[in-house]
Amino acid sequence: MKKRVLSVVLALIMVFAFSVTLTGCGGGDDAGYKVGFICLHDENSTYDKNFLDAANAACEELGVTAVIKTNIPEGQECYDAAAELVDAGCDIIFANSFGHEDFMIQAAKDFPEVEFCHSTGTKAHTEGLDNYHNAFASIYEGRYLAGVAAGMKLNEMIEAGDITASEAKMGYVGAFTYAEVVSGYTSFYLGAKSVCPSVTMDVSFTGSWYDEALEKEAATKLIKGGCVLISQHADSMGAPTACENANVPNVSYNGSTQEACPNTFIVSSRIDWAPYYVYAITAAQNDEAIDADWTGTLETGSVVLTDVNTDVAAKGTVEKLEDVMAKLKAGDVEVFDAKTFTVDGKALSSYKADVDTDAAYEKDTEVIEDGAFKESKFRSAPYFDLQIDGINLLDTKF
């Protein structure tokens, strides 16, 4: 335990950098039960706002108290935040960014009486800690659906004579060239291709999860390069704003941007983390085991779409999305069906992915089954890292 004087000094310093919110939810017998949340940014980031909304919704539903720390970097600050939440009496603590993982693992080792849950992480299934857990959702299904909406918009533009079939090029703003992002933009592209076979896509990376200027710059570059529709896996309003300014259709992520971008927003997919939070908090309250690796799905309500902006989307988009969603739920459509894409001109019949995330990034697990790449089957976090034909990377950022 740090000496009190040092703790006070650190607190005075940290208050300028980090934000802490204590939210009392409900007034039941569980109101004294505290749940900690660690977020990389604050509500100005669409990614973090999505987590914060889910945290508050889950705690409200369960009648427990949320203690929220925002603007926590992917470094020692995460461990410090976790330790402070333990000191504050939190019995279960969640963190929301990929780079938080090693610090959450260390906290789990140091505080074995507290449950630690990390969204987007990859190591829980190999760490073997009873109180450390990973969670993700099959968001590739949501991005595939969003891609279908994008492909329908491209078809509308082709039919109207605004572009030719060969000009049906989308742009995608990514944060990093990680499997999580690769899986997302590939599923989005395959969704579009399922209805617009001539589509191609350029991808540009910013090297940051949240940098509005860089995201806007990347989207503008893609538009100037001939991309007629833009999507993204980055967390600010940079790309949607660039699209609205240029009157280029946009498929956003982590929430609707229709209010700010009414003339270009089509639809958005997102993970609803509330089902996982409710599950994990309830298990912790009841002293029940929490899955080491939990994957939410369309069926659990963890993968959702916003309302479609029918003023911008192609006619029939809502009905088409309902049809494809039903087929995804029934297993009649596989997002990564190997018949629908090639790699270097060749069909894929076998592939080993790096599922266990060792230091050497060794490919350890066969992931092609029944003619499809089985994303999220062998761990919750994405491991699709193939560069398929039709997608052109303008740069890379690791």
Sequence positions of predicted segments:
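A residue-level marker of the well-folded mature domains of exported/periplasmic proteins
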Residues: 28-398
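Intrinsic low-complexity, intrinsically disordered segments enriched in polar/basic residues
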Residues: 3, 26-29
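Bacterial N-terminal signal peptides that target proteins for export
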Residues: 1-9
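Hydrophobic helical h-region of N-terminal Sec-dependent signal peptides
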Residues: 10-18
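C-terminal motif of bacterial Sec signal peptides marking the signal peptidase cleavage site
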Residues: 21-24
